[in-house]
Amino acid sequence: MALDQQAKAKIRAEYATVEGDTGSPEVQVAVLTKRIADLTEHLKVHKHDHHSRRGLLLLVGRRRRLLNYVQKKDINRYRSLIERLGLRR
């Protein structure tokens, strides 16, 4: 389930470190978190959609790897990011 451009732009504006920032780990994790939330809602209705479930697991793994990267690079940025996103890592 892809996000539309307006939703991505809103997320980028909120989590960007500098103007025009699209590739920082914070922005990538925020976009992945939104996609994971949308896919989770989809799977609550469509319980037997196993292809989407696999896609969800791939997204969760990608987000986990990015969060591990941020944690290794700067623990304060990591803590602030999970606080802002409401993740329970």
Curated annotation (Swiss-Prot):
GO cellular component, one term: cytosolic small ribosomal subunit
Keywords on record: Ribonucleoprotein, Ribosomal protein, RNA-binding, rRNA-binding
GO biological process: translation
Matching Gene3D superfamilies: 6.10.250.3130, S15/NS1, RNA-binding
Keyword RNA-binding: yes
HAMAP family for this protein: Ribosomal_uS15_B
Family stated for the protein in its record: Belongs to the universal ribosomal protein uS15 family.
Descriptive protein name: Small ribosomal subunit protein uS15
Source organism of this protein record: Salinispora tropica (strain ATCC BAA-916 / DSM 44818 / JCM 13857 / NBRC 105044 / CNB-440)
This protein's encoding gene: rpsO
